[in-house]
Amino acid sequence: LLDGYDFVLISFALPAIKEAFSLTLVQSASLISAAFISRWIGGLVLGAIGDRYGRKPAMVLSIFMFAFGSIACALAPNFWILFILRLVIGFAMAGEYSASAAYVIESWPKHMRNKASGFLLSGYAFGVIAAAQVDKYFVTWVDSVHPGWGWRALFLTGIVPIVVAIYMRRTLPEAADWSEAKEKGDGEKNDMLAVLFGGQRKILNYIVVVIAFVGLMVIFT
């Protein structure tokens, strides 16, 4: 849901941001692509946190990061601050999706996990619908009261996921499969960061990571 919401949110806000900061076409497009630059490392790091400490902590952390990034975007004074915050949001979204996918699939009964996966993917559509409605009604109203502030108000709606994260932290149990694997001592063996950066090829892997990140920056910006 957050993925779909953010993708449409930045698309709706972009024309107003372009005008507010006098951006070029390339700069405007980079605000969308920024979230894709940091996604791969977000999935890696937050996925490793989910493997080591649990799916629920990884989900809660990623949602808080998304909310922080979104709220901070509303207060961004210039293009570069906004670009960096978009990197934070992309990092968080990848972690949120990987953690929530693992949580849902590991928590549902085995005979229903295909349905669980489909249910999870449908959240993207609901996020798109939610963003469209917020832009249609809330942003229009804010712009009518304070012209030019509508796009900032759109990002401020990022405070809503904080409520969800607090609810999840207090009420949701840990994924059953992860808890079982942890009891058996399998959690550490499956830690993605340890697999990639703790073996004999760790230096090569570090180099590949840097090259990949620089390559994505060049391509998308």
Enumerate the language-model features and the residues they cover.
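Transmembrane-helix signature of 12-pass secondary carriers
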Residues: 1-221
